Design a protein with these regions (language model features):
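Long, positively charged amphipathic alpha-helical accessory segments at protein N-termini or as interdomain linkers
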Residues: 11-13, 17-39, 50-185
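Structural signature of FAD isoalloxazine-binding scaffolds in flavoprotein oxidoreductases
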Residues: 1-7
Length: 185
């Protein structure tokens, strides 16, 4: 299922970072409803993992006072990609509820808009707590590829601004606000 929505959030642009986490939690809730007891985790900032595989990815793009949230969720089994960094999985592969792309998109849109409304009134703190409760890889060693360098460390939490906190080998802390995360070992 591919889904994009254009929004003009009723919050200052400096808080738009939280929409990425809100979108991940909204889709995680809908996938959880389809999968029952299959554990679902979120990977910073907005991927959703199930049974060791990526079931959903979300991207945001902001421009001209609006933000587009693009979401891709795997409903049917996917062809394995030998070059993919993360194995993929799907609702059907995991024995999930039979759902059409349109139904999943409708449910996700309703949940997303409701959560965005809550975020606009309550801020990032409750989003952060919920996201951390479903977070994959707490204290795992990871490498983050940034535009001009790579940093490595143990995932040490999520900042109040959505930044990924890495605890480096020398004991220092690195805050990452953008980058591609790769698990090590």
């Amino acid at each position: 299922m591919y889904f994009s929505i254009l929004l003009r959030p009723a919050i200052d642009k400096r808080y738009w970072f939280g929409l990425s986490f809100v979108a991940a939690l909204a889709m995680r809730a809908e996938l959880a409803a389809c999968l029952g007891n299959v554990p679902l985790q979120v990977k910073w900032p907005n991927d959703i993992l199930a049974d060791g595989g990526k079931i959903c990815g979300i991207l945001l793009e902001a421009r001209n006072g609006a933000v587009v949230i693009g979401t891709g969720a795997n409903i049917t089994p996917v062809v394995p990609l030998t070059l993919a960094k993360h194995p993929a999985t799907s609702l059907q592969s995991l024995g999930g509820e039979q759902v059409t792309p349109e139904d999943l998109a409708d449910r996700y849109a309703a949940g997303l808009l409701s959560r965005i409304s809550t975020y606009e009134t309550q801020g990032f703190a409750p989003v952060r707590l919920e996201w951390l409760s479903h977070c994959a890889h707490i204290d795992s060693m990871m490498r983050v590829s940034l535009p001009d360098m790579q940093v490595e460390g143990h995932f040490d939490g999520l900042g109040a601004d959505g930044a990924l906190h890495l605890r480096r080998a020398d004991g220092s802390r690195q805050e990452v606000t953008t980058g591609d995360v790769e698990l090590m070992g």
